[in-house]
A protein has these predicted regions:
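Blade-level signature of beta-propeller repeat domains, shared across WD40, Kelch, NHL, RCC1
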Residues: 497-523
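A short helix->beta-strand "capping" segment at the edge of beta-propeller domains
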Residues: 33-52, 172-175, 477-489
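Beta-propeller domain segments
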Residues: 33, 37, 72, 98-100, ...
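Beta-strand-rich domains and repeat architectures in extracellular enzymes and scaffolds
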Residues: 46-71, 413-420
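Residue position within the beta-strands of beta-propeller blades
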Residues: 67-68, 117-118, 221, 322-323, ...
Length: 523
């Protein structure tokens, strides 16, 4: 999404009387009495507070979980509601949306002690005389530990990575790297020239970072577009007027083909050891290419993704779901199937709503000085005028399929973490429901939504007749019209993870409140 975590915290400073402590990276929120649930049978307790930018968690036992702190690079072990120990301290670049972002345990844990982490490593900042080219291509395989940085240019080209660590009962030790992905974003370089982005600031967002193991034993990795405008963003020829026509480079590193520097906006599917499953949707296609681009395509499960902070596996069906953040228009909830093309940048929201997508993006000044799609080299005026035109522009890989979202919001409401409740502990009516948190504390101080799925677990069930089209036509940004029936809680702040605990209760991480909450049945 457009807002980096830094910008989010600035908004919070104004809106919620928050003090940011640079020396510790801690965020403290003015007390409002804490979050509440609309169902009187449900209650909330704080499991642990005073955490530093908590972002993700994984249970390793009853009342025992590993918790990631985005800005410190620390993996904290929390036992019985207190930090027991720091089991790993990575030296991260936490500028913008970078940092220590995602965790997944091997499906055979703890017999198989694998713990997988998505994080952003550090690099040497480029000299002021040549700021558009990073000093290093990638970090060393062995992770750097200790001190962190928020220097937005202090990253190698491929500074986002997924590594496997081993849990020995008290600490995490590095095992091996699975994949290294783009991190460096400084698109103000006049190479290629005259794309309109010469004055664009450096960025560090759209890194995705969510990890999940599927019922198939494969590791799914969410990686955002990192601001690229190439083939995996449905610009087959790069950032030309329509994305079609003579091929042009995406940036100073080349493109638009998905080589290592442009391999973004995807959900990857890997074996637990980091190798590529031969049943991936584009495995044969990539093998026939026999080059770097082909090797990357072999790893792809889905593409055309803008960015996402939420991905989860339905415990009942095994289906993969995600949320996708729009720019100003059409946040999404998606059922992700093999070979899915989610449509970005040509389409966001349902394809039939493309005219509304274009209207919103060309007229909105949502925290911006002028309408844009964040990367200035492909502006919103280039969006197609009709659904048919948008569909005709898509980058089509053999075996891919465009898919409309299962649910969307007309104006951005900024969903973040998603998670399924895999128990009846809150009551049978909530078993298997999808819970959705948000990445800004507006409206209602940070709402918590929940969705029922249909009997076949492939669609969103709705009770409100206004939602029969599975689009909430809210009136403006961060406004809840047509979402009233989805609301189940409020005042959670920025929700970065939602998990079912070993006791069956729902656990929710609030980044800005520095707290892990537990939702339980009280009556």
């Amino acid at each position: 999404m457009r807002r980096t975590w830094v910008v989010i915290l600035c908004i919070l400073l104004l809106a919620l009387t928050i003090d940011f402590h640079p020396r510790t990276n801690k965020v403290t929120r003015a007390q409002t009495g804490g979050p509440t649930m609309l169902d009187p049978n449900l209650a909330i307790r704080a499991v642990i507070g005073d955490l530093v930018t908590p972002i993700a968690m994984a249970f390793i036992g009853p009342n025992d979980f590993l918790l990631l702190e985005k800005n410190t690079g620390k993996v904290q072990r929390v036992v019985n509601g207190a930090v027991h120990s720091t089991v790993l301290d990575l030296g991260v670049n936490f500028a913008s949306e970078r940092g220590l972002l995602g965790i997944a345990l091997h499906p055979g844990f703890p017999t198989n002690p694998g713990v997988y982490l998505f994080w952003s490593c550090q690099g040497t900042p480029p000299p002021e005389s040549n700021p558009f080219f990073p000093v290093e291509q990638e970090c060393a395989d062995t992770p750097q530990l200790g001190a962190d940085t928020d220097n937005i240019l202090a990253v190698p080209l491929l500074g986002n990575r997924v590594d496997r660590f081993l849990w020995n009962g008290s600490t995490l030790t590095f095992d091996h790297n699975l994949v290294k992905l783009l991190s460096f974003q400084n698109d103000g370089a006049p190479v290629p020239p005259n794309q309109g982005d010469e004055t664009q600031p450096p960025r560090g967002n759209h890194d995705g970072g969510v990890l999940a193991f599927g019922h198939d034993g494969k590791l799914y990795i969410m990686f955002g577009d990192a601001g690229r405008r190439g083939q995996l963003q449905n610009l087959p020829s790069g950032p030309t007027l329509t994305g079609l026509g003579p091929t042009v480079p995406d940036d100073q590193f080349g493109g638009p083909q998905p080589d290592d520097a442009h391999f973004t906006g995807v959900i990857l599917r890997l074996n637990a050891d980091g190798t590529t499953p031969t049943d991936n949707p584009f495995f044969a296609l990539g093998a026939a290419m026999n080059n770097e681009v082909g090797t990357n395509l072999q790893k792809v499960f889905a593409y055309g993704v803008r960015n996402s902070f939420g991905m989860a596996v339905d415990p009942l069906s095994g289906n993969l779901w995600d949320q996708e953040n729009g720019e100003d228009a059409f946040d999404e909830i998606n059922l992700v199937e093999p070979g899915m093309n989610s449509g970005w940048i040509q389409i966001i929201g349902p394809a039939e709503r493309v005219p509304e997508y274009k209207l919103i993006e060309t007229t909105a000044l949502h925290h911006e000085d002028f309408p844009n799609l964040q990367q200035f080299r492909w502006g919103p005026e280039r969006i197609a005028d009709t659904p048919q035109e948008a569909l005709s522009r898509l980058f089509v890989l053999a075996g891919s399929r465009y898919s409309d979202p299962e649910f969307s919001w007309k104006h951005v409401l900024a969903p973040a973490a998603i998670g399924f409740l895999n128990s009846r502990a809150l009551g049978p009516q909530y078993f298997g429901d999808l819970f959705v948190g948000f990445s800004v504390p507006e409206p209602l101080g940070g709402p918590l939504f929940h969705f029922n799925l249909t009997g076949n677990r492939r669609k969103i069930g709705v009770d409100d007749p206004r939602l029969e089209d599975r689009v909430a036509d809210n009136l403006t940004f961060h406004e809840m019209t047509e979402s009233e029936s989805l609301l189940i809680g409020r005042d959670f702040g920025i929700i970065t993870d939602i998990k079912t605990g070993p006791n069956g209760n729902l656990f929710v991480i609030s980044l800005d409140q520095g707290t892990v909450y537990e939702i339980f049945r009280s009556k």
